[in-house]
Amino acid sequence: MNRIDYIRNEEKKYHDLCYEQYKLFETGSWLYKPVKTVMDLMDYFEGQTNLQVLDLGSGVGRNSIPIAQKIQNTSGTVTCVDLLDSALTKLQTYSKEHDVFEVIKTEQAAIENYYIQPDTYNYIVAISSLEHVQSEEDLKNVLHSMKKGTKTGGINCLIINSNIQEIDLHTNEELDALIEINLPTEHMIYLLKSIYKEWQEIKIEIKELAYNIVRNEREIQLKTNAITFIVQK
């Protein structure tokens, strides 16, 4: 098994377990509520109809279901892309529970293999998902596709992890971070800014985050510089 397959297998185990253990919008995990920044940006589209939203790495719908609720009476659509069928199956169930099944479209694919229709979306969201493409080259290609896929006046909202460290909490040993792309923060920001150079910057922010996860019965602290990068075409 090559490195990418191994990482994706581990990620699948972690997420499958999380989606089984925790219910969407219940306290106890990161599924508890949508990302505030993602929802706040919906104000930009106030009064617009037929909004087309793309959620890359949607998971079980933490952000896409609340977005769908906001646009459900204005003939909009949220297209949700995820690698994990377990996530999309749960997303479909949750979308029925929250009465937005008609508004949500699911597509199973690795983000780097997903074809983004040009000039189609008003709002593209990618939360902690772009660092899971296979290579830096793939990341650049996806970002260019996102740009092409955005309508004039549309917004891209990315939260992308950089400079990720994993530390075994029992031994204090630094482990090889199980992430496909782990770029230094400055490098990642430079890459994003250079690709989106002709777009209007709405917000760029770096937050140091640390949280504990369990992987293969090991308690691990995950440290990351999470970059929020929001731009308008």
Model-predicted segments: where are they?
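Class I (Rossmann-like) S-adenosyl-L-methionine-dependent methyltransferase catalytic domain
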Residues: 1-52, 59-115, 156-233
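A structural alpha-helix within SAM-dependent methyltransferase catalytic domains
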Residues: 65-68, 143-147
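Short catalytic micro-motifs in class I SAM-dependent methyltransferases
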Residues: 128-132
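A short, conserved alpha-helix within the catalytic core of class I
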Residues: 133-145
